[in-house]
Amino acid sequence: YPFVMSVDVASDSFMQTAEMLLEKKATLTIWQGVIPLRYVTGVVAGFGMQENNGWQMRYHLRIEPPLWRCGLRQNFRIFQQQDIRTISATLLNENGVTEWTPLFYEDHPAREFCVQYGESDLAFLSRLWAEEGLFFFERFAADSPEQKLTLCDDVAGLSQAGEFPFNPDTSAGAETECVSMFRYEAHVRPSSVQSQDYTFKVPDWPGMYEQQGENLNGQLEQYEIFDYPGRYKDEQHGKDFTLYQMESLRSDAEKATGQSN
């Protein structure tokens, strides 16, 4: 999921019950003094009653995004001649995920057929999104609790973070936003992907596609992943799926991490 929040709350109401709160919308507001800095909205997925000191009752809430609901349903289902946008819309809307948007920079052609075989809706969607080179995140509004699940296929769809000064001295409180730690890592990962599939409509179609990894940083080039069947029936899907699989396998070949205030 994009996030999971475990929240302890105090209330002067002693009468809150699971029936009143489970699956209700909840918003956590993060304040700096009297200024709200951020809002995170989700669905109450868990409820617990804790201490009662006579004047206040403590409760525990587990808050998850609406996408969490997709993990509670399992099905056997066939989608024919539908693209990833249509399949996603069907399953997300059926699970009550209404605040979402596709942000696609590439073509995602319709699939001849696509089978959900005993998977949860979330596992099925996650598999399809990975095959189509999609990632997802919650896009938060800057000044309101509004947020929207976003499906995206290119980093161009992410918001720019801007520029921040680097200040490794964490002993004193910085008055401005700054980065206090930055690290870079490189790892050996698979160097290429070769995939193949078959269609009875064109028995002699080779159906084989290959994608080489980029930025190998001196590693050996012998680490090939061969995937059969590649879960495609045409050239466009074959090329795209092979590329997306290569990008996924090397997604952490180079990684940067940081900390800020």
Where are these regions (language model features)?
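Amphipathic alpha-helical and helix-coil boundary elements used as assembly
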Residues: 1-261
